[in-house]
UniProtKB/Swiss-Prot annotation:
GO cellular component entries: cytosol
Subcellular location: Cytoplasm
Function: Required for maturation of 30S ribosomal subunits.
Pfam families, per database record: DUF150_C, RimP_N
Protein name per UniProt: Ribosome maturation factor RimP
InterPro entries reported in the protein's UniProt record: Ribosome_maturation_RimP, RimP_C, RimP_C_sf, RimP_N, RimP_N_sf
CDD domains reported for this sequence: YlxS_C
Source organism phylogeny: Bacteria, Pseudomonadati, Pseudomonadota, Gammaproteobacteria, Chromatiales
GO BP terms, alphabetized: ribosomal small subunit assembly; translation
Cited Gene3D superfamilies: Ribosome maturation factor RimP, C-terminal domain, RimP-like superfamily, N-terminal
Amino acid sequence: MAATEDTLYALIDPLLTGMGYELVGIEYGGPAGKRLLRIYIDSPDGITLDDCETCSRQISAVLDVEDPIPGEYTLEISSPGLDRPIFKASDYDRFAGEQIKIRLSAPWEGRRRFKGVLAGLGDEGVRVVEAQGDEVQIPLDLIEKARLILEP
């Protein structure tokens, strides 16, 4: 996690927790002038548009005061949705049994993309059972992006 994201987590996580929400993850990036700060939130009852608006106002107020991001950016508050991105190591166990798509930052065993059934977090990495039935353990530090997927 980049320093900016660490700072954002430190500012936003306690705020959302106090409001009864879970900070699922943070994405920040884009070209200069079009930077986007996307914050994923969740709650046991799910997320409504009103929840997103409430959290947006509270988070925006904190970010205006603390000013952790230089320059202009757009703040977007979102639920993780059904094709939920995975940000936390604990989520690999939490969503075991679900379909997952993983993209790596560098090739591992000759590949950068994996897809299959999430089997949890093992000693050597994220366990995924691929379509042909083989289980792979992907090193956690190589995972650039992971997302649950819906399969018909």
